[in-house]
Amino acid sequence: MSQSKPGLQGDGKSGQGSSQSALTLAALGVVFGDIGTSPLYAFKEAFTGTHGLAVGPENVLAALSALLWAVIVIVAIKYVWVVLSHDNDGEGGVLALTALAHRVMGDQSRRSRFVVAAGVFAAALFYGDAIITPAISVLSAVEGMSIATPEFEHFIVPITIGILIGLFSIQMKGTSVVGKLFGPVTIVWFLCIAWAGVASIVQTPMVLQAVNPLHALRFAVQHTDKAFFLLSAVFLAMTGAEALYADMGHFGSRAVRLGWYGLVFPALMLNYFGQGALLLRDASAASNPFFLLAAPSWLLVFVVLATAATVIASQATISGAYSMTLQASRLGYLPRVRVLHTSDQEQGQIYIPSVNWLMLLAVIALVLAFKSSGALAAAYGIAVSGTMLITTMLVGFVVYLGRSRARGLTLSALACFALLEIGFFASNLTKLEQGGWLPLTLGAIIFIALMTWRDGTQLVAEHRRRLDIPMSDLMSSPMSGVPVVSGTAVYLTSDPKLVPNALFHNLKHFKVMHEQTVFLHVINENTPYVHEGERLRLKPMCNGVWALDMHFGFREQPDIPAALKRLTPDADGEIPNLDPMTTSFFVARVQVVDGPGGLSAWRCALFGWMSRQSASAATYYKLPANQVVELGTQVVL
């Protein structure tokens, strides 16, 4: 039940949406910001971190070689080539991948439940990273001002907070507008860091020896302990890789690949090698090799450009968080959220106000608590390395069960990726005491919330199945004594086999039935989009009563009135009269009450709070306010 998203991927020849070049430009401004600013701190961390190496030719070449080949294997091959090829009908991100793996495995297997839990935990870790990225990225750039003008040091935190407030405030304009604004700046950024790298490499060409992977392998064999700690610094060069996959739904895999291979990867490597060449000439430059790479007359220009680039880096994780939240809500791991579509052409470009402002508050709290990028560096990496490892596992399940032609080769490659990522994750765990606890704690809290919502909604459904009246009993019972009023009643139901609570209360309190009744069941599919021809299924139940199934993909905004306009007659050639003047929509709002069994008291309280934050069914499904009747019901968990 899937279809391609119009105007998103730019792979076709039609004019639906932006051209491929415009999509690639926008992708540069949104997708690559995070990984594109890693030169600000990644290579420096190898020599100035808690377990920093001594600056010398052997160590510099080994660190560069390890960084180069790690980026090639994990980002250029695994993500840009392998992972982007395993999308969920054009949609990326770990939750979309989890839904795909779940669909391939089936609902009932124990292995399937494990995969779903792992995928949800990876999504929770991604949220932790999405909160840390804006804080560390903008801080690292603004700190460059203290190199140019030491008096600026006391203003680093206030300036950082001001920049972050501005960034989150323009999100309502949409990722398309933001991307078009940031895209040209990102191109200038990559060209400038590449130019600075080339200028340094020309002065010390021996740095090119690091292209040989033997430098990294020899260092790993001779200095195993140091190599293990080096992995956590090298990993910082790849922290934006997951955003490439998470944001794929905004711009399509082709735009991501063109941007990576055409500009981003060459520019990053030239700059890293330029920093390495600088350290070979001047060991004292290890304190901040990125900014010291620039000529003194260009330092302020680089600081301003780096600040702009780190704002863009934050955009990658912000837009990724929007996508993740929408998917989590559609797949049943979060309550209904208010989603604004910011483009008439690009369906994947969205803005979620609640997520936007919660992230801003969390990011500001981190900046005030840690105050420097160096303090946050230890916290950076654990969440992403865990998400990467789970992504590899999920792709492995999809490939194994999907039985593709290149299954053996792909699984072998994924096994190699997993071994390397286990090393990265283990190395990052050494930073737990220095701040690594933060993303794991954030991830655990979000994971508990996601699983609590899922478990709570399942318990509510079980409660209904246990206590509610089966629909078959209603259809078989005589209704001749019930007064009939004119008009059409549309009852929203979460389980078509049971009588909707709203109808039960309507009969109990008002003791009437409508002339025509429609039981509407909205089904969220595990695919991003649904063909219009497969969206509606109308089935007659008895005279004047219909069951209507309405299908939406997890990336679509459900719009019941718009979908009903496309309703066609049932098998008997009949169709309910849905005239707005005579049609009413009946919805039930559930109030959760703590009771014995089911969820623990604190999880029940959490579920109740999340339920109260949920957008109303009328707002969520875009029902006309003057046609909605809402009836409340209590559920004891």
At which residue positions do the language-model features occur?
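The structured alpha-helical core of multi-pass membrane proteins
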Residues: 1-637
